């Protein structure tokens, strides 16, 4: 298998052409004809992750957050230069899939959580098209027990909570990463709790004034789910050497 073959497998799974994304999906740095020897999968192509990929002798790094985003300046200097330099001098091909890995119903950052936790009557959720998140229902549970359940699942503490809603809940909506503004969409769809990664000052007032529960578990914690699932998928389809790199980032 070469990188072009791997890209075909990933594109057939994730359908990146359906998304108006914030950056390019697919090969960002490298040679499409390079052979795939070992794939490292991670959340973000930061320098710490790149160094881990080098240390484990990977020649492909597959991430959720790549190097390039809309509106970035063109010069390749500073932090971006350092990251690219380490990739190129170690012959590591960088592949990134952003929104497609959030939205996927099997290996995505959102649907995978809902299915693993046994939510039922699952539907797409979110104000974007295609929708990135998921909503569902479950047996009634106290909100504090629900927080504990999610903390155990994500292996991360809740970073922020605004409990403006019911003390016992039976429905939730989830969009991983930086989606706290979707709390209003969650209220409009009459769910009891909205879960995301990031939070900001308005979320507190919104949760209490809209009478909904809001939970934030960190951008990184909520977006490890998809890369981990993608690691297992690649093993199942015949990629012999694939590892998930868990770089520390509590945000």
From Swiss-Prot:
Gene Ontology molecular function, alphabetical: metal ion binding
Highest taxon of the lineage: Bacteria
GO cellular component: cytoplasm
InterPro entries in the record: DUF34/NIF3, DUF34/NIF3_sf
Gene3D superfamilies xrefs: NIF3 (NGG1p interacting factor 3)-like
Binding locations of a divalent metal cation 1: 64, 102, 223
Keywords associated with the record: Metal-binding
Annotated residues for binding of a divalent metal cation 2: 65, 219, 223
Similarity comment: Belongs to the GTP cyclohydrolase I type 2/NIF3 family.
NCBIfam families linked: YbgI_SA1388
Quaternary structure and interacting proteins, as annotated: Homohexamer.
Family annotation (PANTHER family): GTP CYCLOHYDROLASE 1 TYPE 2 HOMOLOG, NGG1 INTERACTING FACTOR 3
Name the UniProt record assigns to this protein: GTP cyclohydrolase 1 type 2 homolog
Organism: Chlamydia muridarum (strain MoPn / Nigg)
Lineage of the species this protein comes from: Bacteria, Pseudomonadati, Chlamydiota, Chlamydiia, Chlamydiales
């Amino acid at each position: 298998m070469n990188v072009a073959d791997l890209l075909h497998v990933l594109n057939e799974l994730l359908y990146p052409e359906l998304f108006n994304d914030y950056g390019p999906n697919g090969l960002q740095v490298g040679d499409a004809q390079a052979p795939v020897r070992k794939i490292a999968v991670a959340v973000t192509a930061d320098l710490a992750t790149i160094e881990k990929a080098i240390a484990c002798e990977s020649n492909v790094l597959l991430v959720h957050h790549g190097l390039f985003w809309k509106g970035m300046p063109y010069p390749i200097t500073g932090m971006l230069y350092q990251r690219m330099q380490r990739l190129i001098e170690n012959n590591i091909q960088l592949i990134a899939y952003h929104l497609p890995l959030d939205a996927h119903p099997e290996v995505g950052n959102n649907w995978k959580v809902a299915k693993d936790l046994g939510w039922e009557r699952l539907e797409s959720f979110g104000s974007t098209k295609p929708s990135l998140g998921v909503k569902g229902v479950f047996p009634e549970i106290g909100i504090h027990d629900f927080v504990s359940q999610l903390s155990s699942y994500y292996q991360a503490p809740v970073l922020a909570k605004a409990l403006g809603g019911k003390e016992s809940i039976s429905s939730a909506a989830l969009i991983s990463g930086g989606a706290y503004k979707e709390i209003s969409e969650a209220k409009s769809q009459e769910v009891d709790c909205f879960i995301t990664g990031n939070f900001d000052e308005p979320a507190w007032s919104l949760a209490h004034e809209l009478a909904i529960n809001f939970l934030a578990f960190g951008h990184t914690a909520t977006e490890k789910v998809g890369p981990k699932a993608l690691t297992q998928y690649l093993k199942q389809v015949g990629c012999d050497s694939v590892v998930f790199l868990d770089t520390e980032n509590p945000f």
